[in-house]
Amino acid sequence: MRKFLLALLLTFVACVAFSQNATYFGYVRDANKKPVEFANVIVVGTNIGASTDASGYFEINVPAGQDLEVQISFLGYEPFSQKIKLKPNERKQVTAVLNEGAVMLPTADIGATSERQVSGTRLNPQISMKIPTTGGFEDILKALPSVSSNNELSSQYNVRGGNYDENLVFVNDIEVYRPQLIRSGQQEGLSFINPDMVSSILFSAGAFEPKYGDKMSSVLDIKYKKPTEFGASIMASLLGANAHVEGTSKNHLFRYNVGLRYKTSRYLLASMDVSGHYDPSYVDAQTFLIYNVTEKLELNFLGNFSSNKYKYIPLDGETSFGTVSDALKIRTYFEGQEVDRFNSGTAAFSVNYTPSNNLSLKFIASGYYTNEEETYDILAQYYLNEIDQQLGATTGDSVSNIGVGSFLDHARNYYDGFVVSAKHIGTFVKDENKLDWGVQTNYENYSYHVHEWTMNDSADYSLPYSDNAVLLYLTDIANIGLQSIRASAYVQDSYLFKAEGADVSLGGGVRFNFWSFNKQFLASPRVNLSVKPTNWKPDMIFRFATGLYHQPPTIKEARRISDGTLNPNLKAQSSAQVVVGMDYNFLAWGRPFKLVAEAYYKYMYNLNPYNVDNVQIKYYGENIAHGYAYGIEAKVNGEFVPGTESWVSLGLMRTYEDIENDFYTRTVENVVDTVYPGYIPRPTDQLVNFGIFFQDYIPKAPTWKVFLSLHFGTGLPYGPPNSERYMATGRMKAYRRVDFGISKQFNFKKADWIKDFWISLEVFNLLNTKNEISHTWITDIRGRDYAVPSYLTGIRPNLKIVVKF
């Protein structure tokens, strides 16, 4: 593999010699006919390029008699491209006009000045079709320095020290919900977002505007396409298949955007340590319909149905762990099976009314339903052995058996949810002033039944041991329901103006929220400011944002971990956030780049502590903690290779919490001492998050492209089950993953109905790294406890074919 990669890299540096040349020259202007300095001019697929001077002028020599494509780009503007074929010694002049817009990068677009004044990152949904990924669109989010996820099987993600439940997701201004009974990435299917149907995506990692709801960590704002012409696509791989079609009626009054997806992770799961029969099946169908009644009145419908089924019959597994001096191996044999089902549906009707160019009104009525079932009975019998790891040992044979035992896991969990929502949002724009407002009411009806337990038999003794009864190791039982009403409203205003030597954007507003279950009324004021110096030559913008962010509980958060009952006095978790940042557009090696850096601090109060196992979160159901999170982040996007965009990102973060009134006692030399743990790491505390995405093409053969993604994240805290949070003193191994892909694009000149056709070969987990996701605790014959790691997927190749019409 190393020799192959080395040969591939050497191929990239090959140069093309041209015997006859022509000249391509001209000027680059913006929409106001002003010259664009430092615009990047390249001949696609070659190393030929130049940058414009102060007058916007450029001149390049190109090979004569060949079909070439010239691309002109500058950060913050839509690229200009032109296909040419020049005669020997011919001089061709052009005036290229660049319009302000978005230059899509793999992880973010570099928007125009107006876009850069709003805190957030624009993402390209189509890049998920090209990069090697085992998941869906969310893998693009995981490339950002503020986002962490140590599980390639899951679409869930943490943002700046928050957990999975602290992230907002909107599609066409409709909130998207995630499954509640999911406990592992193996159970997860397709996320709501269908990249084939998406037109724009905005992600904010914190300190977002009042219009974006009531969560503490992040918001993902997605808009689906309103097509203007016919289009379709088909994708097939070893992990599933997608198809989508979009188009309009002849009079363009009716438009449609429909997608169908199928996914199976059986191929991936076969690379895990536990062998067995995996039978996952995930199906998702979506439709977005648009009808223009008049020029000012538009009707929309968004529908989604998702069916995820997961059947699992484990057979046996073998896991090695420990250290060089204390190497261990556990062999496990299983009986039983797990059968899960997750069905959900969404239907939303909206009316968009634009009475004038200044005023826009939208009315939405939506409904969401979910039905989830998780059932399993699995008996696991294990044998724990010490391994011979002395120098010269080649077999790794067992030296001695130090533990024998079994686990019996049982669950009958059911969750039903129904949400009906009515919402109105409006926007009024006057000159440089923009006013937004909105009101919303939700009716929620949930039914939540949990019945699960674990029996632990170690060396013929049931743990915990009792002379009088057989006790269960873990139990979780609840039978609860909840009907409630949520109401919210917001108003915000933003104003653009010129100050001495700077363009300034100032925005602010307040959000209100009320929940009938706990009778709590909340107000969340928020302010943001951006300044772009105009008397500086560097193209830089500085940003500041602050505000209060409240997260009203859900039924899952309100369920007490102690007895499974609902806590009607549970308050919203809250945080005060401050974010300062800057972004800087610059040229390096004559090519465009962008640096984005941010620092943040969050003080959190009324926290509801929780434990995490794999992707399952269980809350205490009490406001008994306060904490903080702080960090710095930096990301550089740009053309490391001419004509292609790559990135590198780094995030440093700490998040701690102090659980009130927690303590333990210890005895030292017959003296009993009371210890108060104080601030302890939160379950999402991850010091370093580092990522690279790199893409390249073969000179003289630009239809061959190579993609490489790398992710490194330091270990997360963990501790034994049924223990206090301060006992989570262990750290998982660092998450390390490299994914590689190579693709070939084909052009069918005779079949012009095929717009794009490409085949890619992907290699997931190229280095075959064993990444931990959770631990199982067992006891040996000496009474010592061991945390046996559960590993994620190993190396796996994948073949993918994409056709666009």
Region annotations inferred by a language model:
Residues R29-A31, A39-V44, Q71-Y77, K87-K130, ...:
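Short, acidic, small-residue-rich periplasmic hinge/interaction motif at the N-terminus
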Residues N292-S307, Q337-N518, V596-A599, W647:
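Face-selective signature of the C-terminal outer-membrane beta-barrel domain
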Residues K362-S366, A572-E639, I759-F764:
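Membrane-embedded beta-barrel scaffold of Gram-negative outer-membrane proteins
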Residues S233, L239-Y262, S275-L315, E338-F363, ...:
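Transmembrane beta-barrel wall of Gram-negative outer-membrane proteins
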